[in-house]
Curated annotation (Swiss-Prot):
Annotated knockout phenotype: Homozygous mutant females initially laid eggs but stopped after approximately one week. Many of the embryos derived from these eggs exhibited maternal-effect lethality. The few adults from F1 progeny of homozygous mutant females appear sickly and sub-fertile. Of these, 4% display bilateral gynandromorphism a rare phenotype caused by X chromosome loss during the early embryogenesis. By contrast, embryos from homozygous mutant females displayed X chromosome bridges and second chromosome missegregation and polyploidy.
Role, per record: May play a role in DNA-protein cross-links (DPCs) clearance, ensuring the genomic stability by protecting germ cells and early embryos from various sources of damage. Limits replication stress and DNA double-strand breaks.
Biased composition range(s): Low complexity: 720-748
Cystines in this chain: none
Gene Ontology process terms (BP): protein-DNA covalent cross-linking repair
Higher taxonomy: Eukaryota, Metazoa, Ecdysozoa, Arthropoda, Hexapoda
Biased composition (Polar residues): 298-316, 329-349, 505-516
Protein name, as recorded: Germ cell nuclear acidic protein
Species this protein is from: Drosophila melanogaster (Fruit fly)
Family: Belongs to the serine-aspartate repeat-containing protein (SDr) family.
Source organism, top-level taxon: Eukaryota
Keywords of the record: Chromosome, Cytoplasm
Length: 1030
């Protein structure tokens, strides 16, 4: 069965009232009103005004939050019903009522008929969501009007338009029903009288030919007023809350003429609740409070007036939200639901003198009406007209079976004690949620309405929240003044509880508020902060993005979620263009190579932006910052230490205050440099260094006799042998002093002991030994011929020199017991050599590896080789490595055997010679390299991004390094540069390509030699032929 949602409003057309104003006496109920107890009724629902033209008193509206008033009109309802005393006479008069066909002509005496119909018309704006209504009207008014094709009767039996057809059998009326009909007729007559007095109101936008009313064939219950129908007015302020109608709550109808907007809150109607109708043409803005109707609650009426002199606590300035009622129709089969525009929200409110009559009508018809109520306000996506500022809630009327069940409960008083939870699961959920909502509103107000709390309430309901709510067709009422067509928005009614978080609750375009919901605090979800993503990275949806959307909207993945525009600024086209730019920049960066020129050797920087910056030039700021650093200062002792008195020496040199150890080191250094005499003259007598020099000289036997003859004159010594002594004086010839005092001879013999220590193999003819001659400072005249040959041709003969030195060291130092192979390596750029030790099958072995790039002279090879052989001996013979005690023992043994060797040290201090120098043209930074492997045009400085030039380092005749600009590659380098790309393949390594290039270069170089040889041979043959001819 299809579910339809209607929005009820006053369908009485005041323009069609053709009766002249009549002076009828004011009718009111003679019975005394009685107050309802406060326990079952939260608020007093209504009371009639003492006079229809008097000021309206403040009353609480006992209406459903989701229902508007049924419009009631009848031509014959203005009869005086209150004075009828005889109930039987009235019953007989009412029983004679006949159903008039629609096409029948209007008779002189109109017959009264009650019609419950559902009429709709197309909206003015042409929207699909149009307003609907349930109308109770007089068929005598519309007898001359044709039926629109889109009309639908709510009754299960269709109206017979044939005048010759038999009339509908008249139902038997009981006394109770007669009383109820009497009350109905009285209220209708009062309302008609007031409309006649006040004149016609603003006509509706629909023509009379398009309006219709149809009879609803229903088993109408008795409509007799009781003492509870009229209640005294109340002036208590009405608050917005939830209204719960219990199982036996009777119909509450509010009829009003000038109330413009009725503010009603959410209401949960039970399955057993009877139909609640609300009829109004222009409702005053009022608030309806929470009301719990008990099982035996009588019909409540409300009579209100539009006069401004009444004492009211109603907030007239508050915007009133709209409501909609969901009515599943079961009467007519095959008929479409007609649509009718609502004029209740747009009728003119300028008629301030119009009075309002509110009466209570108990209508019990067999209308199957279901209730589908989301727990909170459902999202009104159909509110494409922006006049509404908040979402509307949907409610429905009870079904006809429920009305019959209510009649049965009224007859059986024991059924009132039936539990509320005895109905189906949907009813249990609604009752549970209503009570929970009521309690939470009392405790927390509106602050508890969050998605988590709503979801928890649903899960805690009787059915566990498993039943899906009905999805009615939301029909929207459009004002008369609405002429602009709005684009319909997607249906968001399925959002249910989350609608208040996804819809803007207020707009400033119109003060009208047709949702009939209380003004609430606007809840907005802020946009998620957008994080900046890399432009080259494509956007990927989150793995739980779809699930998050479904939590909010089960049908649409884009309307309800605020995640849809989280990355609105991210554009694929922009990312593509940016990625293209990045690729171009990468290609440009790939062509350039950045070099770090702050080190001695050039270092290639792959990415200068990401790598740590190289150390820059020294700046004055560094010194200032260094001076500002916190430093730990030595604390002064509490009691100063007493120091011995030291005699101050004025005008004494800085030297002379060394201790014994320092004196020994100074003297040993001077002894190696043959500077003992200079050292003795620099230090004063009595100093530790001077004393140490004297001790060394005494041990070496240097200057022992020279100390006794410093005062003798060398001239006398030279003249004594020349003078011939007389013949008689022979003994003086044998005098010892001339022989003893020979200071020049003694001074000439001083360097002899040092030569014997420094040069163990004394060179013949005054030349230096082999090891000493390998040094570049030794001249060619004093150098050994073989050593000089190796020194001058070291690059070509370094292997032979290494083998020669190895044999010499092994024989003198290691007794020919050391067997160590010697290799050369191009990978060692800073290390002069290394000894690689191995152990295999409990046998130790070593391999000495020498650097080609560091060992560029013969003297470096001499010192490095003995250093590494000492490591090998310590490992092979003693099983120890490193520069420990064993290594130092072997180094001292080598120094003792070869005095010409310098002191064997742990580390070298060789300045590495590079073949090329790279220099920046911008910042003048320079660094060195052993080879050139990149084009100079593609090189840039890492510090200043400036261009780099290349220099070639060469030595002149004096041995000084001269840097000259490097020219173009020549020979094999140029051949490789020109042909490397031609021979390169994907499956070949660079070494394989170089082998091919070497073969090709050798072939190319050998062709001219063969050509020259062939030409020479041809010439020789030609000469021989000439000789033979001669």
């Amino acid at each position: 069965m299809a579910d339809h949602k209607y929005r009820l409003f006053n369908a009485v057309d005041p323009s069609k009232v053709s009766h002249a104003p009549k002076d009828h006496p004011e009718k009111r109920n003679d019975q005394k009103t009685r107050k309802l107890p406060a326990a079952p009724m939260r608020a007093n629902v209504g009371a009639p005004a003492p006079s229809c033209g008097a000021n309206t008193e403040d009353t609480e509206l006992d209406n459903s939050d989701y229902m508007e008033a049924l419009q009631l009109s009848a031509d014959g309802c203005s009869q005086d019903v209150a004075n009828v005393g005889d109930v039987e006479l009235l019953s007989a008069g009412i029983s004679n009522l006949k159903v008039q066909p629609i096409n029948e002509e209007h008779s002189a005496k109109p017959e009264i008929s009650i019609c419950i119909s559902s009429t709709t018309e197309e909206n003015v704006s042409g929207d699909d969501d149009a307003a609907s209504c349930i109308t109770i009207s007089d068929s005598s008014e519309d007898e001359q009007e044709p039926l629109p094709p889109d009309s639908m009767a709510v009754s299960e039996r269709e109206i017979v338009a044939n005048p010759g057809q038999e009339d509908i059998p008249q139902p038997m009326l009981t006394t109770e029903k007669v009383q109820r009909i009497e009350a109905f007729l009285r209220d209708v007559s009062i309302e008609r009288r007031e409309m006649e007095w006040n004149g016609p109101l603003t006509p509706p936008p629909l023509s009379s030919s398009q309006r219709q009313s149809r009879l609803a064939d229903a088993d109408t219950e008795s409509m007799s007023p009781t003492d509870e129908d009229w209640q005294p007015p109340t002036t208590r302020p009405i608050y917005n809350s939830t209204q719960l109608a219990n199982n036996d709550t009777q119909v509450n109808t509010i009829c009003s003429a000038d109330a413009t907007r009725l503010d009603s809150s959410k209401r949960l109607a039970d399955d057993e609740t009877e139909a609640n109708t609300l009829g109004s043409e222009e409702l005053e803005p009022t608030y309806s409070s929470k009301r719990l109707a008990d099982n035996d609650t009588e019909p409540n009426t409300l009579c209100s007036d539009s006069s401004e002199t009444h004492n009211s606590t109603i907030h007239n300035n508050e915007p009133v939200p709209d409501e909609s009622i969901e009515i599943p129709e079961t009467s007519s089969e095959g008929e479409l639901t007609p649509q009718k525009a609502s004029s209740g929200s747009s009728t003119s409110g300028g008629d301030e003198h119009g009075s309002i009559q509110v009466s209570s009508i108990n209508i019990s018809a067999k209308i199957n009406i279901k209730i589908s109520i989301p727990t909170m306000e459902s999202s009104s996506a159909e509110d494409d007209d922006e006049h509404y500022s908040s979402p509307r809630a949907t409610k429905s009327l009870p079904s006809s079976e429920e009305v019959q069940h209510q009649e049965h409960q009224q007859q059986d008083p024991q059924s009132h004690q039936k539990s509320m939870l005895s109905v189906d699961d949907a009813s249990e959920d609604e009752q549970f949620l209503t009570h929970a909502e009521k309690l939470l509103n009392q405790l927390y107000g509106k602050s508890w309405q969050t998605p988590d709390v709503i979801r928890t309430l649903k899960r805690s309901s009787g059915s566990g929240g498993k039943q899906a709510p009905l999805r009615p067709r939301n029909i929207q009422a459009t004002a008369v003044t609405t002429a602009k067509k709005k684009k319909p928005k997607p249906d968001e009614s399925v959002l249910g509880d989350f609608s208040i978080f996804t819809k803007p609750l207020r707009t400033n375009q119109t003060p009208l508020n047709s949702t009939r919901l209380p003004p609430m605090r606007a809840v907005q979800t802020e946009r998620r902060p957008r994080t900046q993503k890399p432009l080259t990275r494509p956007r990927t949806n989150h793995i739980d993005e779809d699930r998050w959307r479904k939590l909010i909207d089960s049908d649409s993945g884009t309307d309800a979620s605020d995640d849809e525009d989280a990355d609105a600024t991210f554009s694929e086209s922009g990312s593509d263009s940016d990625s293209d730019k990045d690729k171009e920049n990468k290609q440009k960066r790939g062509d350039l190579t950045y070099l770090d020129l702050s080190k001695d050797e050039v270092e290639v920087i792959s990415n200068p932006d990401q790598d740590s910056p190289s150390p820059k030039c020294h700046r004055r700021l560094d010194d200032i910052l260094r001076s500002c650093r916190a430093s730990v200062k030595a604390k002064l002792p509490a009691t100063p230490v007493q120091q011995p008195n030291i005699r101050r020496q004025l005008f004494t040199p800085n030297a002379g205050f060394e201790n014994d150890n320092q004196a020994k080191e100074i003297v040993n250094r001077a002894l190696d440099l043959d500077m003992l005499d200079e050292l003795e003259s620099d230090y004063l007598p009595g100093t530790p260094v001077h004393r140490r020099v004297q001790e060394v000289k005494k041990k070496l036997g240097i200057g022992q006799q020279g100390q006794t003859t410093p005062h003798e004159s060398p001239i006398l010594k030279l003249l004594t042998p020349k003078t011939a002594p007389p013949k008689g004086t022979a003994p003086p010839k044998t005098s010892a002093p001339p022989k003893v005092s020979t200071p020049p001879k003694s001074t000439k013999q001083i360097p002899k002991p040092r030569k014997q220590k420094d040069l163990s193999p004394v060179a013949s003819g005054g030349k230096c030994g082999f090891l000493k001659s390998l040094e570049g400072q030794v001249s060619r005249d004093r150098a050994d011929n073989e050593a000089f040959f190796y020194r001058e041709n070291f690059a070509r003969n370094k292997d032979q020199l290494a083998q020669h030195l190895y044999k010499m060291y092994n024989a003198q130092v290691f007794n020919n017991e050391l067997d160590v192979p010697i290799t050369w390596s191009k990978l060692l750029r800073n290390t002069a050599g290394r000894c690689m030790n191995k152990r295999k099958l409990n046998q130790r072995s070593s391999v000495v590896e020498l650097s080609v790039k560091v060992l560029t002279t013969a003297d470096r090879l001499r010192c490095t080789l003995i250093h590494e052989l000492c490591h090998a001996a310590a490992w092979v013979f003693n099983g120890e490595g490193g520069h420990g005690r064993v290594w130092k023992m072997w180094a001292q043994r080598a120094n003792d055997k070869f005095p010409d060797l310098p002191q064997i040290k742990v580390c070298h201090n060789y300045s590495i010679e590079f073949k090329y120098t790279y220099k920046c043209l911008s910042c003048d930074k320079a660094s060195h390299a052993h080879s050139r492997s990149r084009k100079v045009e593609d090189l840039r400085c890492r510090i200043c991004r400036g261009p780099i030039t290349l220099f070639l380092n060469k030595k002149d005749k004096q041995g000084n390094t001269v840097s000259t600009p490097a020219g173009e590659a020549k020979g094999f380098a140029k051949f490789v540069k020109d042909n490397f790309q031609r021979h390169k393949r994907d499956n070949m390594t660079a070494a394989q390509v170089m082998r091919i290039l070497s073969v090709e270069y050798a072939k190319q170089k050998g062709q001219p030699a063969e050509e020259t040889a062939a030409s020479i041979a041809s010439r020789v043959e030609t000469l021989t032929l000439d000789e033979s001819s001669n």
